[in-house]
From Swiss-Prot:
Native source organism of the sequence: Bacillus subtilis (strain 168)
One Pfam family from the record: YmzC
Keyword entries, A-Z: Signal
Extent of the signal sequence: 1-26
Name this polypeptide is given: Uncharacterized protein YmzC
Signal found in the keyword field: yes
Originating gene: ymzC
Amino acid sequence: MFESEAELRRIRIALVWIAVFLLFGACGNQDTIIETDNGNSDYETPQPTSFPLEHNHFGVMEDGYIKIYEYNESRNEVKLKKEYADDELE
């Protein structure tokens, strides 16, 4: 009986050592990268601008063009209806 208790104690100690090793091993391998935007960026990606229109239509202004789309609710699809250059509307 004493032999089995000693064996269980050794197993318990081994499990504690494995847990401690895994805990500190996992904590030591974390690399943290922090990116900050300081506002000195010369390049900005152009963002499309959308605006609602009447009767399931909407417009998207992108790269100097205005595109008019129609949304069909029954088929859940969007269809390009017209496209204008930005300077045509002035």
